[in-house]
Amino acid sequence: KNRQFLEAFDPYDGPLYKYLDAEAQKAGFKLVMTLDTPFRSYAFTSRSGVESLESVRGVKVRVTMSPIEKGFVNTLAMNPCPVGWTEVYTALQQGTVDGEIINFGTFASFNRAEIEDRFLVTRHNMAKVFVVMNKARFDALSPEQQKMIIDAGRKSQMEEWDMSQEFERKGEEYCRQHNIKLIELSDEELAGIRKNLQPLYAEYMKDIDPVFIKLIQEVQK
């Protein structure tokens, strides 16, 4: 994640904002701003025995019902287990699952050091939150009022970006203070994961507008 990524969502000249706003307007909405979430990795209990990328094979990992999330877990040869968020802590305690997808900040907020003691740092997953307004209501406002809303959204978006980075930094600091083992992956290991994910990419990218894909790839350079 870099500053270029944030700038791509700028309401005034960001290419990703312009694309998404145009798509939202087709559905009757005006895109006001986007919000970030930190990148997520995998945390595990000591029971999992995870010490490296190779040792995750067969480990039971909590996932949502997202087919992409399940597909990623399968790519790493782990065992995806759908569990509701409110049940995860108990599932980890009881051994129903031995790991979960989570970011550093949330790990700290929910005091996961009580039950998990290691992180496989993949930073492979993140979510964007979109704040929209009824387009007819927005169009009925004066240009000055419209600008006030977009300006406020832009300011909030930029401040939330910084807050998200700080949330993640403090979460990683929490992990180090609680002696959580951080298993960092080499460039070769990350390249191997990307290669193995190509079939999953191909399966879902065929349903996504290639213009949107190209815009995302541009800001990832």
Q: Where are these predicted regions, by residue range?
A:
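N-terminal secretory/targeting leader peptides
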Residues: 1-6, 22-221
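Core domains of carbohydrate- and sulfate-ester-processing enzymes
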Residues: 14-20
